[in-house]
């Protein structure tokens, strides 16, 4: 790989370097200042925003639900990558010289793969949870313990996938500078790095996005393409509306990730088509822009949560209540308002000519109602023809942010 790609690449520095060449990528000071400001925005926004997301969930007992644990894992992975890799990657890309030693060279090439893997498979787990909750509501849901086990498995697989790149990373002293690079085992066709590169790209991008796309397509057809019965209860309308809002929010999260990382993956597939492209002097600016877009994916989720979810918005307002231009809202009063199902009941609705079943099953110790006004009906008419009914007992308990989120 040529100079700029060898030193710049976080995830796939997989092309050999001509180490005899001097550093040809030198930028004027004003460009460095602009890029530094742009990358600083990512670090500050991502770290602060994702830490607040973790606080909103973990500091409020009823936010500690199955799906929200995956959101905590997602926030942790993104905040960690922003904190540990963004600044280092920027300085390396700008100066084309490695200042941080062998250990951090290995970590710098190792951790981003693990973090991206953990991020995208946390989103996949959320998509699977939404799929099961809406398409197969009568099936058993993950317990809190099982959810933590799944998160641990995600990280174990992430670390295993990233291990080869960290293991083969090394520093090399050139005539005027030190570079961080990956020395793959010798092979005439560089088969090891090519296979690894393709496997990583498939596993951390195309495969999970394919699974997520299928899950949300089926969920979307169920929630939007089906006709809501005209005589169904207000509670049913509220639940369907709430589920739609949640799915919309998660689709925005996934699409944002896909858009941010697509140019990055395309960029590192180009050496197999036109290796000489990386010898162009303008390629450093292209790389800085592409890397900024990829790294910026770590800062958007807190903004999306705040914009599209009332409870997260309230949590952010409370977290930043000391700011003079932010109204904290009725945080204390809102904590006293929540409606939760205490009995596990199946609410089955026959929807549209396809007889699509949309069931709502709420665990006695787990999920809570999502959006909409909180009511306490003693009996609900559950089908379009009124032939099936189920009594649901409810009671008012203290507020949970999650009552607006992902039941």
Swiss-Prot record:
Residue ranges, annotated region (Disordered): 365-394
Keyword RNA-binding: no
Topology feature Extracellular, residues: 1-31, 87-106, 170-194, 271-283
Cytoplasmic topological intervals: 55-64, 129-148, 220-248, 309-407
Domain of life from the UniProt record: Eukaryota
Disulfide bond residue pairs: 105-180
A Pfam family that the UniProt record links to this protein: 7tm_1
Membrane topology, from the record: Multi-pass membrane protein
Residues bearing glycans: 14, 18
Lipid-modified sites (S-palmitoyl cysteine): 322
A single Gene Ontology CC term: sperm midpiece
Keyword annotations of the record: Cell membrane, Disulfide bond, G-protein coupled receptor, Glycoprotein, Lipoprotein, Membrane, Palmitate, Receptor, Transducer, Transmembrane, Transmembrane helix
Any one GO molecular function term: substance P receptor activity
Compartment list: Cell membrane
Primary location: membrane
GO terms (BP aspect): positive regulation of cytosolic calcium ion concentration; positive regulation of flagellated sperm motility; regulation of uterine smooth muscle contraction; response to pain
Record field: compositional bias (Polar residues): 375-394
Claim: Transmembrane is one of the keywords in the record: yes
Transmembrane spans: 32-54, 65-86, 107-128, 149-169, 195-219, 249-270, 284-308
Family note: Belongs to the G-protein coupled receptor 1 family.
Role this protein plays: This is a receptor for the tachykinin neuropeptide substance P. It is probably associated with G proteins that activate a phosphatidylinositol-calcium second messenger system.
Subunit-structure text: Interacts with ARRB1.
Protein name: Substance-P receptor
Species: Canis lupus familiaris
């Amino acid at each position: 790989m040529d100079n700029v790609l060898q030193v710049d690449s976080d995830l796939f520095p997989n092309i050999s370097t001509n180490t005899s060449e001097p550093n040809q990528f030198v930028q004027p000071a004003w460009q460095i200042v602009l890029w530094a400001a742009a990358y600083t925005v990512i670090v500050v926004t991502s770290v602060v925003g994702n830490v607040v997301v973790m606080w909103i969930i973990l500091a409020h007992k009823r936010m500690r639900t199955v799906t929200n644990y995956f959101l905590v894992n997602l926030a942790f992975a993104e905040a960690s990558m922003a904190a540990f890799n963004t600044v280092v990657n920027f300085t390396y890309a700008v100066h084309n010289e490695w200042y941080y030693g062998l250990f951090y060279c290995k970590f710098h090439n190792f951790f981003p793969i693990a973090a991206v893997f953990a991020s995208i498979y946390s989103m996949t787990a959320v998509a699977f949870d939404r799929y099961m909750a809406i398409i197969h509501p009568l099936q058993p849901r993950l317990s809190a313990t099982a959810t933590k086990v799944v998160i641990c498995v995600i990280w174990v697989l992430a670390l295993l996938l990233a291990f080869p790149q960290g293991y083969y990373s090394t520093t090399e002293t050139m005539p005027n500078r030190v570079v961080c690079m990956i020395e793959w085992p010798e092979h005439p066709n560089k088969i090891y790095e090519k296979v690894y590169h393709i496997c990583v790209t498939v596993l951390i991008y195309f495969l999970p996005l394919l699974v997520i796309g299928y899950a949300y397509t089926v969920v979307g057809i169920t929630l939007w393409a089906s006709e809501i019965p005209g005589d169904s209860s207000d509670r049913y309308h509220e639940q369907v509306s709430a589920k739609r809002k949640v799915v919309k929010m998660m689709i925005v999260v996934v699409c944002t990730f896909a858009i941010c990382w697509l140019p990055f993956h395309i960029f590192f597939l180009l050496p197999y088509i036109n290796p000489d492209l990386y010898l162009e002097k303008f390629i450093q600016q292209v790389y800085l822009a592409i890397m900024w877009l990829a790294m910026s994916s770590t800062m958007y989720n807190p903004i999306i949560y705040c914009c599209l979810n009332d409870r997260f918005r309230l949590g952010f307002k409370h977290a930043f209540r000391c700011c003079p231009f932010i109204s904290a809202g009725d945080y204390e009063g809102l904590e006293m308002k929540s409606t939760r199902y205490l009995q596990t009941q199946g609410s089955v609705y026959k929807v549209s000519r396809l007889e699509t079943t949309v069931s709502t099953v709420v665990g006695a110790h787990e999920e809570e109602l999502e959006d909409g006004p909180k009511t306490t009906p003693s009996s609900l008419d559950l089908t379009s023809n009124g032939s099936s009914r189920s009594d649901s007992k409810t009671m008012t308990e203290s507020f949970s942010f999650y009552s607006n989120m992902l039941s």
